[in-house]
């Protein structure tokens, strides 16, 4: 099984250097603390920008001006005010979804948020690879990127610990669950099944989706 977003090209964004990048980079922030702790709001900015382009009701989330050359950093700064890291970064997945929902409300849009927690190895039963696959598949089928929070990277050499990244595609193979992520202005592929087996601290998958207005009676 393979699933991807309908318009991955919408995830190509212009950085402060004037060059196109897959996704965004927290190092674009101006402040040193933001550059250190800004993976969560950076992931949120990328995800909300994509939603604004593919779901017409969510267009106000990121109007074209927010995506213009040289303007995306200002959009990241706007997101920071809602998806705001604390002393330990943005370590609560519910804070991520609630921040996105609050930002959406500030622009007249409604979102719904869902979280699949993956506890640390010694604190309870983890969701299976199949459960993670189903969560990801439902989000991608709805044309919504997924935010992946990773507290410890396990045996994955290309994934930072204590880190948020947007997840934009998935391919299931025999004993592997290959996921495409955007990280540091680059596209990478990780094996989520291997991460589930080897990460000691776990993490979470989070998704925000359009919440349709109730129909008028």
What are these regions (language model features)?
Residues 38, 90-94, 126-130, 142, ...:
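Short, amphipathic alpha-helical segments
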Residues 64, 122-126, 157-160:
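Short, flexible/disordered intra-domain loops and linkers
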């Amino acid at each position: 099984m393979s699933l991807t977003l309908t318009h991955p090209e919408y995830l190509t964004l212009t950085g402060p250097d004037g060059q196109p990048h897959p996704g965004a980079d927290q190092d674009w922030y101006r402040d040193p603390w933001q550059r250190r702790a800004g993976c969560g709001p950076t992931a949120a900015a990328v995800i909300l920008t994509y939603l604004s382009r593919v779901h017409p009701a969510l267009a106000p989330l990121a109007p074209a001006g927010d995506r213009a050359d040289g303007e995306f950093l200002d959009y990241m700064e706007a997101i920071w005010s809602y998806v705001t890291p604390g002393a330990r970064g943005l370590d609560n997945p519910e804070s991520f979804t609630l921040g996105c929902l609050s930002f959406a409300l500030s622009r007249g849009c409604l979102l719904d948020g869902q979280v699949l927690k993956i506890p640390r190895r010694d604190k309870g039963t983890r969701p299976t690879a199949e459960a993670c696959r189903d969560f990801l598949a439902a989000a991608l089928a709805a044309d919504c990127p997924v935010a992946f929070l990773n507290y410890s990277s396990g045996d994955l050499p290309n994934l930072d610990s204590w880190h948020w990244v947007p997840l934009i595609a998935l391919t299931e193979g025999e004993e592997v669950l290959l996921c495409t992520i955007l990280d540091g202005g680059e596209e990478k592929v990780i094996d989520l099944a291997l991460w589930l087996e080897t990460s000691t601290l776990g993490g979470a998958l989070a998704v925000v989706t359009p919440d349709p207005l109730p129909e008028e009676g």
